[in-house]
Regions:
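Hydrophobic structural segments
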Residues: 86-340
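Class I S-adenosyl-L-methionine
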Residues: 1-86
Length: 340
């Protein structure tokens, strides 16, 4: 019967000399199999050893140490014995996201994926954020998260330098992993556009614009028609941010939407017969185009039209990985301020 004392587990072992040479890098590894990792004490001890081995493995990888492969094998061996106390790797979470929002479906200009760290990162806590900023990295470290999942890629354009203040540098320094799901999550079922439609209470949603064979924008109907100004206020109140809007001069019933920077879909929204179009940000000529076409256009902010996906994503992943704690970042906010 093991006895615990803080982070140590004591038990009685009977060993005999066998003259077999033991790998002195990790003495006692053969005894790991004798530990009952299904017991609360054994599981807690095994998790501590996994974290310790993961730190060692990370250092070995940085130094290109040939022993890194053996250490990773040891990590996976211990993890495989923890029935009922599953160990989750970052790669498994990446694969789960890839199932419902395939990374290969991202737009050509995009850079989603596992951008910092390793698939073999052991994950107990995950932070979810729209952007990976220095503040978010510091929050992840303080709250014990080893993986950050963001919507916007932490590395988007090619880097010519990597200063210490860059979030990717900070993540590597703290041995964190980053998975970024951008336009693949925008267009996925249950992704940004779906969540935006739900936030606005739209019904009977269907695609109105396509990127290859994927829905780039959705079209739905309001339960109750509204005037253009009332609809703009409705969007503001539903999404919680300031809005710019063009008065289309007619009652709004059918609404097109695209989260983020969707102003390029203005023409298609008109062609689809929408009374209004909701997106995050638009250009001046797109405002003029909407005005000329009698389309009420509401630019509700990039941040506000995309943050709607964060909590549903957290819930979805928490259901898939109940042993992992998923939490939304608290230090990220809309960088754009509105003065009424």
């Amino acid at each position: 019967m093991p006895v615990t004392d803080n982070d140590r587990v004591y038990t009685v072992m009977l060993a005999r000399y066998s003259a077999t040479e033991q790998n002195d890098t990790f003495p006692g590894f053969d005894f790991v199999g004798a530990l009952d990792v299904k017991s609360p004490e054994g599981a807690a001890y095994a998790r501590r050893q996994l974290r310790h081995l993961t730190r060692i493995w990370g250092g070995q990888r940085v130094k290109d140490d040939p022993a890194a492969a053996d250490t990773l094998t040891m990590i996976r061996t211990i993890a495989s014995r923890m029935d009922g106390h599953p160990v989750v790797f970052a790669g498994e979470i990446y694969d789960e996201i890839d199932r419902f929002a395939p990374f290969a479906t991202a737009m050509d200009f995009d850079n989603p994926g596992l951008l910092v760290g390793s698939r073999d990162q052991i994950v107990e806590k995950v932070m979810i954020a729209l952007d990976i900023t220095p503040q978010v990295v510091r929050e992840a470290v303080s709250r014990g998260a080893s993986l950050i999942i963001s919507h916007h890629p932490v590395i988007f354009d090619p880097l010519r330098t990597l200063p210490e203040a860059h979030p990717a540098y900070m993540m590597a320094h703290h041995r964190l992993t980053a998975i970024c799901a951008h336009t693949n999550l925008d267009m996925a079922p249950g992704g940004v556009n779906t969540c935006l439609a739900e936030a606005l209470g739209l019904q009977n949603c269907r695609p109105f614009a396509w990127y290859h064979d994927l829905p780039e924008g959705l079209l739905g109907t309001l339960p109750t028609p509204q005037s253009a100004e009332a609809f703009a206020r409705y969007v503001r109140d539903r999404l919680g941010g300031g809005v710019q809007w063009v008065d289309g001069g007619r009652t709004v019933h059918t609404v097109a939407l695209c989260g983020g920077a969707g102003g390029n879909l203005t023409t298609q929204a008109v062609q689809a017969g929408a009374d209004a179009f909701v997106t995050g940000e638009v250009r001046h000529h797109q405002l003029l185009e909407a005005q000329a076409a009698g389309l009420t256009l509401v630019a509700a902010g990039h941040y506000c039209t995309e943050r709607v996906v964060l909590e549903p994503l957290r819930q979805r992943l928490a259901e898939a990985f109940p042993a992992v704690e998923f939490m939304c970042a608290e230090t990220v906010s809309d960088p754009a301020h509105t003065i009424a």
